Amino acid sequence: MAKKSMVEREKKRARLRQKYEAKRTELKEQFRTAEDFEEKLAIHQKLQELPRNSAPSRHRNRCLTTGRPRGYYRDFGLSRNVLREWAHQGLLPGVVKSSW
């Protein structure tokens, strides 16, 4: 199990990312279309003033049950350990052990 503080920190980042998503994309579009260098500097400064945790690159996928950040399967939203347990118990529809 991951520390609760880490899971809560990740939830806070998700809220911030959602809150500033529109403003960030708007500023990036303005930056892309700006022709003057001073204008680009001003837009870049505005981007820098946004909260650091609102950037999408700060997002870390975590397991829904354990909060584990490593070994994450996007299709299920689970870590490899929980995925294996749940698959053995038959809790994931359509998942079968491979055999060849």
From Swiss-Prot:
GO terms for cellular component: cytoplasm; small ribosomal subunit. NCBIfam families: PRK08881.1. Gene3D superfamilies: 1.10.287.1480. Belongs to the universal ribosomal protein uS14 family. This is Small ribosomal subunit protein uS14. Part of the 30S ribosomal subunit. Contacts proteins S3 and S10. GO terms for molecular function: rRNA binding; structural constituent of ribosome. One of its GO terms (biological process) is translation. The gene is rpsN. InterPro entries: Ribosomal_uS14, Ribosomal_uS14_bac/plastid, Ribosomal_uS14_CS. It comes from Microcystis aeruginosa (strain NIES-843 / IAM M-2473). Binds 16S rRNA, required for the assembly of 30S particles and may also be responsible for determining the conformation of the 16S rRNA at the A site. Keywords: Ribonucleoprotein, Ribosomal protein, RNA-binding, rRNA-binding.
